[in-house]
Amino acid sequence: MLGEDWNSRRLRKALIEEYPYLQPRNVWTDKIAEDYDYEYIRGEHELPEGWFELFLQMCEDIREPLIKADYLNEFRFSQLKEKYGSMRVYTFGATSEVNDIIAKYEFLSQQICCVCGKPATTQTYGWICPYCFEHVKNSGEKLDDCAVIDIKTSYVRRIWSAGSHMETVVDCSDEWQRYLKRIGYTDD
């Protein structure tokens, strides 16, 4: 879907049919506005543009577990945003499998340019944001004032349960490779 016209109501309608949780609803009543005309979809204006393809890939990955749990039409995002240089996804309840998938994509977002969606090379200080080399130059930040990002495709998840501590390595390499393929990225 990269490069498609996001202003297309046809595209928005198709996305909502595939992922009903993208349809905006009233936060208090959970109802869809009677005059809703596919003017926007959930996440479109809430996340940096560079992360939207990653977000849609996450939506694809959570769809099957939601169907399996018979929760596809009830699942809702409560908030989507950027915070401390990563995508944050809050829900109105999800299965542990869906939460695990969301956590992977939140981790991967830290390594994706928030402007264009390419792999990030730098991260700014102050207002933390990952940028590719091209966009950090346009951000007004001095390169000397930025941290270099070493792309990682796994992270350590720490769980505390019944007074004991357990660590697990979470591998995101499949999701990362699918994302790079999705955006047509090559190292050339």
What is the predicted function of each stretch?
Residues 66-70, 110-114, 140:
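Residue-level signal for secondary-structure boundary elements
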Residues 131-139, 161-165:
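TerminUS-proximal long segments
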